[in-house]
């Protein structure tokens, strides 16, 4: 028996990477009976039945699991947002950060196209970088033109399983191509190298990039907060935690409650006002959703 990690699932076969070698495996029938489906990213115990074939015997406990794309044990999310073209969107970034935090995945913020910055926009982006770093997030400024930040990004990918996410047109494919040129990913679709037509079955594959594994399908294609409870939301704004203990009421939602230390910190500028505004917007959105039974 040996241990490995599923890097691709296709037509009933699971491709397991173990000690630098890939084994084409099938799952045991017991998985079907238990209604358990092995996922790309799963760490598994398998037995080899030949030079490059085998059977999966056991799926190890998952650290986390994404639905879209269907991948398990993601360690970090590379959140790519462009400085310009399209313009940087702090609210969309905050939405991604909440989703990533809720899945117990470490976010790494990558700001792309910084070579296109000039004048006032340069200082605007610099302030965002300071704000997010102050919260405790890792922020990498990159350019595929000047190659700035690429070495730092590679060091974060090394030895980890990552998904890449972010708004469209921000240069996700360009970044991965810069790190591994033989991928030749087309701009606008991280997954074109799989030769998908519009109606073919989507599958996800982990690509070896910079000493780590990167999902070839954009992560977090669903941006709703459906799986998050309202009272959990403050926890996914890390800078709120230090102030939350000082709120008068236990379980304070930091909206309109009296003597709310988080709201006071936002009013004093100790919490970035736009972060607090985005939080209020997300609270309102979650209050409007239909109840789940």
UniProtKB/Swiss-Prot annotation:
Signal peptide: none
Cofactor comment: Binds 1 zinc ion per subunit.
Record flagged with keyword RNA-binding: yes
Gene3D superfamilies on file: Nucleic acid-binding proteins, P-loop containing nucleotide triphosphate hydrolases, Probable gtpase engc, domain 3
GO molecular function annotation: GTP binding; GTPase activity; metal ion binding; rRNA binding
Chain positions recorded as GTP binding sites: 112-115, 166-174
Compartment(s) where it occurs, according to its Swiss-Prot or TrEMBL record: Cytoplasm
Cofactor(s) of this protein: Zn(2+)
UniProt domain CP-type G: residue ranges: 63-223
Alphabetized PROSITE patterns for the sequence: ENGC_GTPASE, G_CP
The protein's Enzyme Commission number: 3.6.1.-
Stored Pfam families: RsgA_GTPase (PF03193), RsgA_N (PF16745)
Main location: cytoplasm
Disulfide bond annotation, renumbered to this chain: none
Swiss-Prot/TrEMBL keywords: Cytoplasm, GTP-binding, Hydrolase, Metal-binding, Nucleotide-binding, Ribosome biogenesis, RNA-binding, rRNA-binding, Zinc
Top EC class of this enzyme: hydrolase
Residues annotated for Zn(2+) binding in this entry: 247, 252, 254, 260
Any GO BP: ribosomal small subunit biogenesis
Domain of life of the organism encoding this protein: Bacteria
Known role: One of several proteins that assist in the late maturation steps of the functional core of the 30S ribosomal subunit. Helps release RbfA from mature subunits. May play a role in the assembly of ribosomal proteins into the subunit. Circularly permuted GTPase that catalyzes slow GTP hydrolysis, GTPase activity is stimulated by the 30S ribosomal subunit.
Family label: Belongs to the TRAFAC class YlqF/YawG GTPase family. RsgA subfamily.
Record note on quaternary structure: Monomer. Associates with 30S ribosomal subunit, binds 16S rRNA.
Protein name: Small ribosomal subunit biogenesis GTPase RsgA
Organism: Geobacillus thermodenitrificans (strain NG80-2)
Gene name of the encoded protein: rsgA
């Amino acid at each position: 028996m040996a241990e490995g990690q599923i890097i691709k699932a296709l037509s009933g076969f699971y491709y397991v990477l173990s000690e630098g070698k890939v084994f084409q495996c099938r799952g045991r029938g017991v998985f079907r009976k238990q209604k358990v489906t092995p996922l790309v990213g799963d760490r598994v115990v398998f037995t080899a039945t030949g030079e490059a074939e085998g059977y999966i015997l056991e799926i190890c406990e998952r650290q986390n699991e994404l639905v879209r794309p269907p991948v398990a044990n993601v360690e970090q999310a590379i959140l790519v947002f462009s400085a310009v073209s399209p313009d940087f969107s702090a609210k969309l970034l905050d939405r991604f950060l909440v989703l990533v935090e809720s899945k117990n995945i470490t976010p790494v913020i990558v700001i792309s196209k910084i070579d296109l910055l000039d004048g006032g926009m340069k200082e605007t982006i610099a302030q965002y970088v300071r704000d997010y770093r102050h919260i405790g997030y890792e922020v990498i400024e990159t350019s595929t033109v000047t190659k700035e930040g690429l070495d730092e990004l590679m060091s974060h990918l090394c030895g980890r399983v990552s998904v890449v996410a972010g708004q469209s047109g921000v240069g996700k494919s360009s970044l991965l191509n810069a790190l591994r040129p033989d991928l030749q990913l087309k701009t606008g679709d991280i997954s074109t190298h799989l030769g998908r037509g519009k109606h073919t079955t989507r599958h996800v594959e982990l690509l070896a990039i910079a000493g780590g594994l990167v999902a070839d399908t954009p992560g977090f294609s669903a941006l709703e907060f459906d799986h998050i409870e309202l009272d959990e939301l403050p926890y996914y704004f890390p800078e709120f935690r230090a102030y939350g203990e000082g709120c008068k009421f236990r379980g304070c939602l930091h909206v309109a409650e009296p003597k709310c230390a988080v709201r006071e910190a936002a009013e004093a500028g100790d919490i970035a006002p736009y972060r607090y505004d985005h939080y209020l917007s997300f609270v309102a959105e979650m209050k409007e959703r239909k109840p789940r039974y």
